[in-house]
């Protein structure tokens, strides 16, 4: 059966107190609306329509790579009105449409699949996702008849004292038979205190026609919406622990899961150990047997097997097998570090290639450079890559030794098996096998301190 989905993402999110549209606030490194889209894709949903309004262009930009369609809700006149705005997307389709909200990022693909299966097997015209909660205050209640079938949804403010005792709540997420939904959308009215068109009224219309309406109860955490910064933090914590549990089940050791921050799309292979305080973001891939000591940030990078990283930042880069990084190293985008290399403390690498076995142990800047294997950089080496207008390239051959406090003024080439004397400023090509010394000859002026009256 054909399966489609509509995501309601037009709300202003006033309680967030933010210029950013609510659905674009991130949970575990990804916008809430993109979390929902990803979940629906994993649920074999064929077409997805995003109903947008507030900050529409920003939402489009953030979701441009997700292959969703868009419907515009110029005025936010309720959830029923949002489905009216998606009418063009729904017309001509047969089957089931799942309706979700863009501010509920905790729903899982397993739950979506279960809901659709429940809907189809029961031959329901509408299915409501519900949850049993300890404190149902503020939520619409699911009222069932003596046979356990859904009778109606009653908003909290309209509940009788007996109905207030019901702790099964409406999540605001549904599955509908598309044709029945379309047949009833125009029957909605806004004769209520808010002057809005409520999607819950569709349930009542269907029941009046004698249509079957079902309800499936799910984990309360999955239906939690985000309307405030506090709820955003709560969703972050729930999803973070869910992600961390998945990695541990796959053979990753997390020393302190509550204080380890791993993004939704991060991949980690078995026998890697992650200490607390690490932040792994984007499309990062950590291969087997790595050790990430406390307090590193790694984003959109590939870390090969056997790497050790201490308190460092690695962005959009590649680190080869059995390399050590840090503490306090900064590897900037488009860098590639070879195998068995050493990138030490207070070293910054930018848009450079570092060969296998090369050691850059401390207090060094390498930018826009191609460095061979087996090299050694002394403390305080700087690749002077910027002339005030252009970023220039430096090439350093294999097995070269760069002495302490050396400036390599780009563009410049240092060939294989060369030595650069400490304190040199290199501006010309150094031939293979040569020693380059580029510093003034030392001069000692006898008795100078006494002559200047500086002797103590």
Curated annotation (Swiss-Prot):
Pathway: Nucleotide-sugar biosynthesis; UDP-N-acetyl-alpha-D-glucosamine biosynthesis; N-acetyl-alpha-D-glucosamine 1-phosphate from alpha-D-glucosamine 6-phosphate (route II): step 2/2; Nucleotide-sugar biosynthesis; UDP-N-acetyl-alpha-D-glucosamine biosynthesis; UDP-N-acetyl-alpha-D-glucosamine from N-acetyl-alpha-D-glucosamine 1-phosphate: step 1/1; Bacterial outer membrane biogenesis; LPS lipid A biosynthesis. Acetyl-CoA binds at residues 385-386, 422, 439. Keywords: Acyltransferase, Cell shape, Cell wall biogenesis/degradation, Cytoplasm, Magnesium, Metal-binding, Multifunctional enzyme, Nucleotidyltransferase, Peptidoglycan synthesis, Repeat, Transferase. It is found in: Cytoplasm. Residues 251-456 are annotated as: N-acetyltransferase. The keyword Nucleotidyltransferase applies. UDP-N-acetyl-alpha-D-glucosamine binds at residues 8-11, 22, 73, 78-79, 140, 155, 170, 227, 332, 350, 365, 376. Its main location: cytoplasm. GO terms for biological process: cell morphogenesis; cell wall organization; lipid A biosynthetic process; peptidoglycan biosynthetic process; regulation of cell shape; UDP-N-acetylglucosamine biosynthetic process. It comes from the Bacteria. Residues 1-229 are annotated as: Pyrophosphorylase. InterPro entries: Bifunctional_GlmU, GlmU-like, GlmU_C_LbH, Hexapep, Hexapep_transf_CS, NTP_transferase_dom, Nucleotide-diphossugar_trans, Trimer_LpxA-like_sf. Catalyzes the last two sequential reactions in the de novo biosynthetic pathway for UDP-N-acetylglucosamine (UDP-GlcNAc). The C-terminal domain catalyzes the transfer of acetyl group from acetyl coenzyme A to glucosamine-1-phosphate (GlcN-1-P) to produce N-acetylglucosamine-1-phosphate (GlcNAc-1-P), which is converted into UDP-GlcNAc by the transfer of uridine 5-monophosphate (from uridine 5-triphosphate), a reaction catalyzed by the N-terminal domain. In the N-terminal section; belongs to the N-acetylglucosamine-1-phosphate uridyltransferase family. This is Bifunctional protein GlmU. It comes from Clostridium novyi (strain NT). The lineage of its organism: Bacteria, Bacillati, Bacillota, Clostridia, Eubacteriales. The gene is glmU.
């Amino acid at each position: 059966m054909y399966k489609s989905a509509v995501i309601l993402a037009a709300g202003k999110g006033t309680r967030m107190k933010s210029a950013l549209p609510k659905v674009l606030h991130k949970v575990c490194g990804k916008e809430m609306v993109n979390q929902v889209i990803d979940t629906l894709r994993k649920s074999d949903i064929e077409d997805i329509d995003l109903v947008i309004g507030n900050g529409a262009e920003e939402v489009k930009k953030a979701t441009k790579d997700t292959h969703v369609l868009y419907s515009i809700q110029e005025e936010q006149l309720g959830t029923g009105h949002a489905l009216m705005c998606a009418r063009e997307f729904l017309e001509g389709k047969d089957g089931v449409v799942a309706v979700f909200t863009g501010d509920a990022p905790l729903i899982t693909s397993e739950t979506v699949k279960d809901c659709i299966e429940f809907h189809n097997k029961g031959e329901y015209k509408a299915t409501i996702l519900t949850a049993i909660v300890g404190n149902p205050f503020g939520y619409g209640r699911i009222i069932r008849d003596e046979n356990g079938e859904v009778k109606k949804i009653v908003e909290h403010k309209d509940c009788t004292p007996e109905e207030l005792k019901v702790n099964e709540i409406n999540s605001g997420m549904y599955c509908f038979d598309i044709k029945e939904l379309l047949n009833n959308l125009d029957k909605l009215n806004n004769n209520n205190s808010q002057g809005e068109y409520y999607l819950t009224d569709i349930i009542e219309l269907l029941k009046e026609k004698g249509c079957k309406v079902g309800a499936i109860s799910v984990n309360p955490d999955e239906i939690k919406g985000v309307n405030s910064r506090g709820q955003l933090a709560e969703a972050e914590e729930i999803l973070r622990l869910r992600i961390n549990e998945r990695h541990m089940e796959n053979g990753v050791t997390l020393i302190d899961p509550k204080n380890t921050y791993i993004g939704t799309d991060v991949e980690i292979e078995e026998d890697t150990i992650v200490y607390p305080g690490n932040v792994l973001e984007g499309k990062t891939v950590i291969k087997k047997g790595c050790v990430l000591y406390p307090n590193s940030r790694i984003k959109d990078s590939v870390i090969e097997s056997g790497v050790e990283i201490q308190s460092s930042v690695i962005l959009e880069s590649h680190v080869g097998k059995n390399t050590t990084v840090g503490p306090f190293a900064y590897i900037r985008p488009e860098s590639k570090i070879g195998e068995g290399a050493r990138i030490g403390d207070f070293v910054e690498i930018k848009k450079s290639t570092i060969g296998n076995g090369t050691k850059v142990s401390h207090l060094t800047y390498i930018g826009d450079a191609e460095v061979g294997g087996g090299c050694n950089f002394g403390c305080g080496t700087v690749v002077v890559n910027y002339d005030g207008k252009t970023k220039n390239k430096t090439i350093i051959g294999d097995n070269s030794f760069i002495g302490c406090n050396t400036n390599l003024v780009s563009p410049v080439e240092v060939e294989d098996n060369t030595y650069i004397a400490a304190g040199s400023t290199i501006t010309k090509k150094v031939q293979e096998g040569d020693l380059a010394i580029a510093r003034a000859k030392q001069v000692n002026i006898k008795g100078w301190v006494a002559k200047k009256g500086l002797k103590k």
